[in-house]
């Protein structure tokens, strides 16, 4: 295992992201070609009419304002209608370069594998070392505790990997629709959709960066534990399991942290509100069920008491035989 040839998370990531990235490139190219003609025509008409009104004095605006608007139109048109320009300044930065730069700055792994693969493989290698050093009858307990330890690490890695894949898949969909939302920035009535798109793009980018940072930090912590000297599995088992559980809980909280850092993404706010509604419905259902159970119990007890009274009255009416 020292060569890190087994990389399950990196392989699964490739199976998921490679076709999605191809679909994103196709979508960006198709949208750029589709909106190129109408957007260029609208830009030319707007610049001509706006410039004519400013030149003739029909609009009380300066040439500086005209130049600012022309620069905005040129930039937006170039970003929305040119797929290569969009890929260079949007897709490559938010989908690849930013996350890779932060990962390379924080990650000191001796292998180019995914950080979760590195954690899993190092844990498995250390477990095999402890198992090989145990005596014959102790191997059963070492194997049991080692299996539980590896399961805890697997749960931690799967939780982080799911959050990472969720952020990357969401980025694929958001970036794929980028040319359309960028073109909406030209009009005051639709500029709010571009602002929402930028907020959501930053939200999931921050989420992806947080996953890389937390994964690297937890990797260093686990490796610090695994690199220590342990005479038995009983000393190695507790810290690894506790760190894995804490890491899984932190990964679960990352979407909320990313949403707060990006001033609130619409998806997570909706998810939190939906979760609150579901919790309220469940608690209301539980209260209703408890009240119904109490009502049924009181009804049954009342029926039983009435039956007992009737039985006593019947015994008194019959008298002695």
Curated annotation (Swiss-Prot):
Membrane-crossing segments per the record: 30-50, 59-79, 142-162, 169-189, 206-226, 231-251
Coiled coil: none
InterPro entries: Conjugal_tfr_TrbL/VirB6
Topology of this chain in the membrane: Multi-pass membrane protein
One GO cellular component, as annotated: plasma membrane
GO biological process: protein secretion by the type IV secretion system
Short name of any one Pfam family annotated for the protein: TrbL
Location in the cell: Cell inner membrane
Keywords associated with the record: Cell inner membrane, Cell membrane, Membrane, Transmembrane, Transmembrane helix, Transport, Virulence
Family named by the database record: Belongs to the TrbL/VirB6 family.
Summary of the function given for this chain in its UniProt record: Component of the type IV secretion system VirB/VirD4 which could be a major virulence determinant for subversion of human endothelial cell (HEC) function.
Protein name per the record: Type IV secretion system protein VirB6
Taxonomic placement: Bacteria, Pseudomonadati, Pseudomonadota, Alphaproteobacteria, Hyphomicrobiales
Chain's gene name: virB6
